[in-house]
C-alpha cells in the first residue's frame, strides 16, 4: 500500500536545485522519512537520476553511525561528489542524532555541528541537500535560524483522512471506523 503525499512531494520537487537546504519538519511519525526516502527517491529514479547519485545517510542506523560526526559526513560526501560533473542528491535522515565534535584546528573553540557540515556542502554546486529529523523544535527553530534565507522548510503533517482513504479505498465509513480504531 502506497500512501500518496502529493502536496509535500510537489513542494520538494518545486524546491529542487534552488541552492537551499531542504528541511523536512513535523511531529514524530508523520511520514517525513517516508516522503524523502520512498516518494521523493522514487520520483528521482523515475526522472532518470542514477541510484548511486542519491546519497542517503540514516543517522538512526548503526551502519551510518560514524556519519553522526559532521566532519565524517562532510568528508564522505565530498569524496563522492567533488570534482564530478554529474548532479547528486544528499538525504540525511534523523539529523537530530548528529554529534557536535571538537574543532581539530581549535580544540578549545566552538564545536563543529551539522550546520557547519551542511553549510560547507552547500557550496558544492552539483549537490542538492535534503534533511529530516524527529526533533521538530531543533529542526524548525535552530536549523531555520542558522540557515535563515538559505533553507526551505517543508512542514509535514499527519495523514489526512483523504490521504488515508486514497490508500485503502473501499467504503468510506468502514475506512473511517478502521482509522479511528488505529
What kind of feature is each model-predicted range?
Residues 1-19:
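Pre-Walker A adenine-sensing motif
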Residues 24:
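Hydrophobic anchor at the beta1->P-loop junction of P-loop NTPases
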Residues 27:
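P-loop (Walker A) phosphate-binding loop of NTP-binding proteins
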Residues 33:
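Walker A/P-loop
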Residues 55-86:
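Short glycine-rich substrate-engagement loop in P-loop NTPases that contacts/grips substrate
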Residues 91, 128-134, 155:
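Structural recognition of the conserved hydrophobic beta-strand(s) that form the central parallel beta-sheet
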Residues 96-130:
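Conserved Walker B catalytic segment
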Residues 140-182:
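Interdomain motor-coupling "hinge/lid" segment immediately C-terminal to the ATP-binding subdomain
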Amino acid at each position: 500500500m502506497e500512501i500518496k503525499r502529493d502536496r509535500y512531494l510537489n513542494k520538494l520537487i518545486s524546491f529542487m536545485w534552488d541552492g537551499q537546504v531542504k528541511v523536512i519538519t513535523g511531529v514524530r511519525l508523520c511520514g517525513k522519512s517516508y516522503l524523502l526516502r520512498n516518494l521523493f527517491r522514487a520520483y528521482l529514479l523515475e526522472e532518470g537520476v542514477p541510484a548511486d547519485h542519491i546519497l542517503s545517510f540514516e543517522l538512526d542506523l548503526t551502519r551510518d553511525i560514524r556519519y553522526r560526526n559532521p566532519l565524517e559526513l562532510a568528508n564522505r560526501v565530498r569524496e563522492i561528489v567533488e570534482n564530478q560533473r554529474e548532479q547528486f542528491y544528499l538525504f540525511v535522515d534523523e539529523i537530530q542524532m548528529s554529534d557536535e565534535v571538537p574543532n581539530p584546528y581549535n580544540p578549545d573553540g566552538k564545536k563543529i555541528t551539522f550546520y557547519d557540515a551542511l553549510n560547507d556542502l552547500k557550496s558544492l554546486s552539483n549537490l542538492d541537500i535534503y534533511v529530516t529529523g524527529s526533533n521538530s523544535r531543533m529542526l524548525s527553530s535552530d536549523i531555520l535560524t542558522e540557515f535563515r534565507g538559505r533553507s526551505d522548510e517543508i512542514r509535514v503533517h499527519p495523514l489526512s483522512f483523504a490521504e488515508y482513504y486514497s490508500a485503502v479505498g473501499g467504503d468510506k465509513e468502514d475506512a473511517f471506523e478502521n482509522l479511528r480504531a488505529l
